[in-house]
């Protein structure tokens, strides 16, 4: 769905190999504006959409779209929000500058995936995170969602990629995470 990078290839190949050996995987990714919904046959899943997620004291609507990868028996769930993911780029603008709201986009994506997994009533054995954009998952599972039984036995694996993130977040990043009552020490 995105340009070929090591991260994109691994995000597909690892779950494909697990499925090929009898496992059950689901892929979650942001529905970036450069993803062609018609060509990839994305459609909204009404029963999963419709909730608002609070990010930095603002209610943001969560839209869940899904597509299947032909011949692979794999579903991809797209976390969508017009304000965060409509732009026709992934993490940087046309001048190669990181978007100022990437921190809020990370929070929204993290909470969106977790809430969607809860609605699916699917208890994953392993969550495999790819890249810095997913780096808040362990923090949110350990704190904000610590009492969710669906994640009680879940293990987390993280893949970090070279030159995945070069930059700094806004000074307000910690405050935005703290809004979800996540202590500074975490």
Stretches with model-predicted labels:
Residues 1-186:
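Catalytic cores of nucleotide-sugar-dependent glycosyltransferases that transfer UDP/GDP/TDP-activated
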